[in-house]
Amino acid sequence: MRLLPFLFILYITNYLDRTSLAYAAIGMSRDVGFSDRVLGLGSGIFFISYVALQIPGALLVERWSARRMISATMIAWGSLTALTALVHTPSQLYLARFVLGAAEAGFFPGVIVYLSHWFIKEDRAKATSNFMAAIPLSFVLGSPIAGWILGHKWFAVEGWRWLFVLEGMPAIVLGAVAFFVLTDWPREAAWLAPKQRQWITQKLEEEKPGGPQAITVGQILRSRTVVLLGATAFLDYFAAYVMIFWLPTILKRQSGLSDMRVGLLGAIPYVVAFIAMLINGWHSDRNGERRWHSAVPVFIAAISLLGLIRLPGSTPLTVVLLSTACVITAFLPAFWAIPTEVLSESAAAATVGMVNAVGSVAGFAGPYAFGYLHARTGSFSYGFAMIAVFALAAGFLVLLTPGVRERAPAKPLAP
C-alpha cells in the first residue's frame, strides 16, 4: 500500500507532462505562429531521445538505484516541462522536447523493473495494472484540467505557458518526495517488519531464473523472446497511440457535437479502459497466466475497430465501439509481467528497455500513418482497417512468447 499508490500518482504526472503539448498547441499556433508541421515535429522529436535511452535507463535502475533514478528523472522532466513555457521559436521547441524525451526515458522501464524487485510473480501483473491504470485516468483528468488552465491569462501571461509551468511543478515536488518514500529493495525497508522483509526477499530469490546474469546487446537482439516481445509491443502501441491521439477527432467528425460535449464523451472510453486494465491484471495474477491475458484485450479491440469501418454514424454506437477499442490498453499489465518472469534480472531490465523503445517508435509512426491515410482517402475506414490488422498481429505474436513454465532456468535469455 505504500509503493503502488505513490507510483500511480507519479505516472499520472508523467503522462500529463508528456501530453501537455497536445493541449498547448492551439495557443502556441495562435500566439507564436507555430504551424502544424512545427508542432507535429515537436511532438515526434520527443521519441528520438526517449527511444535511444530506454535500455540505459532500465539498467541504471537495476545496477544503481531505483529510488535515485526515479527521483532524478522526475525532477529533470518537471523542470524541462516548466521551461517549455519560455519557447518562442521552433528550434527552442525542438530542443525542449528532445531533452524532455531524454529525461523521461528511464522512468517507465525503470518502474517495471522496480516492481519486479518488490512483487512476487503471482502479484506482479496486478501491481503493473494498478500502476499503468494511470494512463487512461490521466486522459480522463488531463482534458478538463488543461482546458481550465488554457482559459486563464494570469499576470498577462498566456494560458498555454501557464499550462507547462503548472503541470511541470508537481513532478519536481514529487521527484523530491520520491527520494524519501521509495526503497530500492525489501531488505532495506525499515517500514516493514523483519519477518515481512525476510519472507519477500526469500520468495523473490526463489523465483529468480538461474544462470549467468551478465548479458550483451547482441544476446538481447538474438533472443527469440525479445524479438517477439518487441514486435508485439510495436504493433500494439501502434494501434493504442492512434486511439490516444485521434479519439477526440474521430468523435468530433462522427458526431458533430460541440467541443465540450466531445471532451466529455471522450472520457468514457478511458474510464472503460481503466476498469478493463484493473480487472485483466487481477485475473491474470489469479490464474497465473500472461499470454492469453495479453492477447484477448487486443483481439477485442481489433473486432471493435473493424466494426467502426461499417459504422452507420450513430454517436452512441461510436462511443461504444471506441470504448471497446480502448480496451487494447488492458493488454499492458500481463504483457509487461512476461519479461520479468521468464528472464534473469539483468536480462529483464535490458529487455524491458529494448521492448519499450521499440514500442515507443510506434508513438510517432501510428498517429502519423493514420493521419496520412485519412488525408489521402478522406475516410477513417482505411486507418481503422490498418490498426485492426496490427492489433490482430500483436495478439497472435504474444501467444508465441515463452510462458513461465517454458523458460530454460540455466539461461539469462529465453531462446
Q: Which sequence ranges carry the predicted segments?
A:
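Extracytoplasmic
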Residues: 2-36, 142, 243-248
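C-terminal transmembrane helical hairpin of 12-TM major facilitator-type secondary transporters
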Residues: 290-338
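Conserved MFS/SLC helix-loop-helix module at the cytosolic interface between two early adjacent transmembrane helices
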Residues: 52-91
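Glycine-rich segments within core transmembrane alpha-helices of 12-TM secondary carriers
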Residues: 126-147, 170-171, 356-366
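Cytoplasmic membrane-interface "Motif A"-like loop-to-helix N-cap segments
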Residues: 63-74, 285-298
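Helix-breaking motifs and short loop linkers at transmembrane-helix boundaries and internal kinks
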Residues: 33, 65, 86-92, 103, ...
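Extracytoplasmic gate region of multi-pass secondary transporters
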Residues: 21-22, 218-278, 332, 336
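Cytoplasmic helix-loop-helix junction between adjacent transmembrane helices
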Residues: 96-133
